[in-house]
């Protein structure tokens, strides 16, 4: 059974709820085993992730509007530290952002910042706890990213 790892941080429970439902969907519909790493549980510890993973990040920013001010991440920085440590960013297939669309420009801004900072794609987004449509859409995008990564690995193998 193939495996995918979801590395995330959940502060209010919305992201955790989404990750649990996404994990079940990936298992039931794609026969994937999903390993979950909630950064909140690690208490600022880091370690090398050996396998490919997808990061899932809620948006927590300091006030403002995300244009003139309010672009500074708060509360979720341990996920960025984890991705930056031990070369983990190189094994990240991409990031999924979550947020609240009421915050306009700030919606999923932190995930966009991580994609730019680490050089991996923003795979998609969902609002609050996510809907069943979000689960199926993002599961498909994860599978596509995993497939692209696998085919790139195959192309870089030396000819025998």
Swiss-Prot record:
What superkingdom does the record give? Bacteria
The molecular function terms of the Gene Ontology recorded here are: FMN binding
**Pfam families this protein is in?**
Flavodoxin_NdrI
> Per the UniProt entry, what are the Gene Ontology biological process annotations, in alphabetical order?
protein modification process
The UniProt entry's sequence similarity note says: Belongs to the NrdI family.
Q: Which PANTHER family match?
A: PROTEIN NRDI
Instruction: Report the protein name in the record.
Output: Putative NrdI-like protein
Q: State the organism of origin.
A: Streptococcus pyogenes serotype M6 (strain ATCC BAA-946 / MGAS10394)
**Taxonomic lineage from the root:** Bacteria, Bacillati, Bacillota, Bacilli, Lactobacillales
